[in-house]
Amino acid sequence: YINVNVGSGSVREMSEWIEYMTSDVESPLTEQRKKNGRAEPWKLEYLGVGNENWGCGGNMRPEYYADVYKRYQTFCHNYSGNRLYRIACGSSSADYNWTEVMMKNLDSNNVDAIDLHYYTMPVWPEMESATDFDDELYYKTIAAANFSDELITRHSEIMNRYDPEKKIGLVI
């Protein structure tokens, strides 16, 4: 899994990284990969196009991100038998409007999945220890994790209205 930066990175930069990593055709980029010690291309299955674009990934509106996503994915070339599974940035938690807008603007010809961002730590980012917590924090974390089921159900319902054949996946 590689995630490309659509907030401050360029389409060309993304396209060249994909070629560098996955192509076996002789080119300046594949020659550079060989000089860097990797003769064979990597198998890259999952490609995230943007990350948390509603927040730290660019503070984008869903309509704007959908347009940006479509432009970037146009240049996500498959090299040497490597097929990229293109993942669009999905919503933060219960932002169902984000999913609605993505599904209105994207289809299975240009996206393979939409991801869902949900963090179950009730005091994140202050939570640093995986073992130093009290019972109250434990139960709050379990309650937050239980909310995942509702999120998956509701986002899936939106996706299924636009994609009844379920060609577009939901990635958690």
Protein language model regions, located:
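Active-site-proximal beta-strand/loop segments in catalytic clefts of secreted hydrolases
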Residues: N3-G7, V49-E52, C89-S92, L116-Y119
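Alpha-helical scaffolding within the catalytic cores
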Residues: D24-A39, A94-L106
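Glycine- and acidic
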Residues: Y1-N5, N51-N59, T131-A143
